[in-house]
């Protein structure tokens, strides 16, 4: 490489075009519910069953909502699980697939982005959320864990739903 005058520094590919990011400033109110956003393909490894187990531990009267965006083979199972459980049905909205441009509105409403994947390197949605200044909750086992400090997100070990 040195013969070609090329730096030996590794090349980093950024999956999120920060020039394309729109202003998603959002007004926060201390009186409103906390909005969590999760986006991705609805498959087992995304950890949604694990997330739903953790959500069922939150008291019913807590003011929050979880907006789940994406499609896949697990979507109907997740919708049924929400419908069958009162603690989830009032708080979790499984929206299915939405147009990419609609995600801007979802990010604008979100207070926290959740990436509960049990096997994921670094998802593009994680980078998108971070680029919009949204704090992230994710597992402390894969690529996403290297992107955070205590000011930008929360990591959990992924050993139990109680920890989550």
PLM regions and their residue ranges:
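Conserved donor-binding/catalytic core segment of Leloir-type glycosyltransferases
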Residues: 29-46, 52-55, 67
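Nucleotide-activated donor-binding/catalytic signature segment of Leloir-type glycosyltransferases, i.e.
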Residues: 79-98
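Donor nucleotide-sugar binding/catalytic pocket of nucleotide-sugar-dependent glycosyltransferases
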Residues: 1-23
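Short alpha-helical donor nucleotide-sugar binding micro-motif in glycosyltransferases
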Residues: 97-98, 105-110
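Conserved acidic donor-binding segment of nucleotide-sugar-dependent glycosyltransferases
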Residues: 150, 154-161
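Aromatic "clamp/platform" in nucleotide-sugar-dependent glycosyltransferases that forms part
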Residues: 118
